[in-house]
């Protein structure tokens, strides 16, 4: 680590567990049950095709994920990563988490490969907006400009990773360690 030209930190749901967030799979995980209350697999409910067909169903589940994230604070792991970034010239965090806790801890060089639940994007005109939480949002929320349904800027099951995040990761990898 002392001799590395760059450091890449990779995190997933486990890093936010000490902040009180459940992991997605396993005992106590958000997706512990095989099926949702609607009798559908969570992978089907939280998918792009379902968002197009039944946005209210997708949003009900996304809102429950956001509610779990609401008010949660970065933990010591998030803080240490942010401190490392401030002390080293090139530190990049690649995270699968959509909770935004790395940024909340002060990290600036974060690649959120699965997106961020606090950014909404219009499915009609691609307008984006940041939201602190979903409290008070009509579900599904609609774009103020074109009235199309908005979606959280997260990767749903079956969707491709965001090209900009993948390109940034590729740039970091090509720059070497």
Residue ranges and their predicted role:
Residues 1-177:
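Conserved catalytic core of sirtuin-type NAD+-dependent deacylases
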